[in-house]
């Protein structure tokens, strides 16, 4: 039997696509190779950080990263080798680190950040139950130079709240005297990504969306300019529309004769319990070492580190130890009780712009990947964009694709 819409990938982007397609009245089937219980979306920091925050590739990032490498505090770790794509990625990353590109990207972040926030509100109205707080993102600065640089960008719009080192401790009780101060970006929010994923899965299942868990897509059957069949290790599935949202895994993208400039960036998190009085009052980011610390219902999560050009899916204990060491330099001693360590791969483009839109060869294939560390931030917005695109029928008819897709960005 031919299915109307097949979404390949059960992460936040895939589920968001299924959610918005269902809202338009489509019959949707989600195919996910795992049991859907612990993918990369679950290990996310949970930041909805679209507002007044620069992308990874921004002016000064290259020099700052080199300085942090010397201190072993750099957020990016490159495993250099014979992979040509890595060097192409680095070159594009460096070229994107300019004021013009950053200004445009931040404007797009705001546009699609508000769309995501609206959709999170709708999900809650739909009866989903997940930890969601609109209480800002606290940017904590440990270098006077970067703190002063940030202060110059702050205006009196209400989107910023400048805090001294002493005032910062009211929001982050565990920081020590090695910090310079902080800026609360008031428009940002945070969620518990695991709760979002479970709530979204439950809602979609109850709404009649079909889920094929533990079923891996291994190939496609092509006929002329269409994908005639989706081949899993169990069966062949036909579909009118196929949405490919497989995150950092490039295997199926390559099956469609594409090779996007996107790297699987290995990220780490540690989730633990700590005394309530010591927990951060809102989501926080140690800006100079790119380490997020996010309060949740019963736990706290720290996330950091992005390793490029590695396929090793095991947790690197040295990286975990390095995260703890970097955090300890700016906090008072505290115990991470019942700590759970995690790592996973994020689909990272060099300029934080995702690959969205219809495939150039196959007319019933839509791509939705490349959000990197911003999956929770923009996943709901991407789902809405893709659903609208399916109605428009062509990339050029959809303004959001033209604005926010790497297919149309130099």
From Swiss-Prot:
One of its GO terms (cellular component) is plasma membrane. This is D-amino acid dehydrogenase. InterPro entries: FAD-dep_OxRdtase, FAD/NAD-bd_sf. The gene is dadA. GO terms for molecular function: D-amino-acid dehydrogenase activity. The keyword Signal does not apply. Catalyzes the oxidative deamination of D-amino acids. Has broad substrate specificity; is mostly active on D-proline, and to a lesser extent, on several other D-amino acids such as D-alanine, D-phenylalanine and D-serine. Mediates electron transport from D-proline to coenzyme Q1 in vitro, and is involved in the electron transport chain from D-proline to the c-type cytochrome in vivo. It is a peripheral membrane protein. Activity is markedly inhibited by benzoate, and moderately by SH reagents such as p-hydroxymercuribenzoate, iodoacetamide, and iodoacetate. Its main location: membrane. Optimum pH is 8. Its cofactor is FAD. It is found in: Cell inner membrane. Keywords: Cell inner membrane, Cell membrane, Electron transport, FAD, Flavoprotein, Membrane, Oxidoreductase, Transport. Pfam families: DAO. FAD binds at residues 9-14. The keyword Zinc-finger does not apply. Optimum temperature is 37 degrees Celsius. It catalyses: a D-alpha-amino acid + a quinone + H2O = a 2-oxocarboxylate + a quinol + NH4(+).
């Amino acid at each position: 039997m031919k299915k109307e819409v097949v979404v390949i990938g059960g992460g936040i982007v895939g589920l968001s696509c299924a959610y918005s397609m269902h809202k338009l009245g489509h019959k949707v089937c989600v195919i996910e190779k795992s049991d859907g219980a612990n993918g990369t979306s679950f290990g996310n920091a949970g930041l909805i950080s679209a507002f007044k925050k620069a992308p990874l590739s921004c002016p000064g990032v290259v020099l700052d990263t080199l300085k942090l490498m010397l201190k072993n505090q750099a957020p990016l770790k490159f495993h250099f080798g014979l992979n040509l794509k890595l060097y192409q990625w680095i070159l594009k990353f460096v070229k994107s680190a300019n004021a013009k590109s950053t200004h445009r990207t931040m404007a797009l972040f705001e546009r699609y950040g508000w769309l995501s926030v609206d959709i999170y509100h709708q999900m809650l109205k739909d009866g989903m139950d997940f930890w969601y707080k609109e209480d800002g993102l606290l940017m904590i600065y440990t270098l006077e130079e970067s703190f002063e640089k940030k202060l110059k960008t702050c205006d009196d719009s209400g989107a910023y709240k400048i805090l001294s080192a002493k005032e910062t401790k009211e929001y982050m009780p565990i920081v020590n005297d090695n910090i310079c101060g902080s800026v609360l970006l008031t428009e940002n929010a945070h969620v518990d990504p695991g709760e979002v994923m479970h709530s979204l899965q439950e809602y979609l299942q109850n709404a009649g969306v079909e889920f094929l868990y533990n079923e891996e897509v291994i190939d496609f059957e092509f006929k002329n300019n269409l994908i005639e069949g989706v081949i899993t290790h169990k069966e062949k599935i036909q579909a009118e529309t196929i949405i490919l949202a497989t995150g950092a895994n490039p295997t199926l993208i390559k099956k469609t004769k594409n090779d996007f400039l996107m790297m699987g960036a290995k990220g780490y998190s540690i989730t633990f319990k700590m005394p309530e009085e010591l927990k951060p009052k809102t989501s926080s980011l140690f800006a100079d070492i790119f380490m997020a610390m996010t309060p949740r219902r019963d736990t706290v999560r720290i996330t950091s580190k992005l390793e490029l050009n590695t396929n090793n899916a095991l947790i690197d204990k040295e990286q975990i130890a390095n995260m703890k060491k970097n955090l300890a330099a700016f906090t008072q001693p505290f115990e991470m009780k019942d700590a759970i360590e995690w790592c996973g791969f994020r689909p990272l483009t060099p300029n934080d712009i995702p690959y969205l839109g219809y495939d150039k060869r196959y007319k019933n294939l839509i791509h939705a990947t490349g959000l990197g560390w911003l999956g929770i931030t923009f996943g709901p917005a991407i789902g809405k964009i893709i659903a609208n695109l399916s109605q428009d029928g062509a990339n050029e008819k959809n303004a959001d694709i033209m604005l926010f897709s790497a297919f149309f960005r130099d």
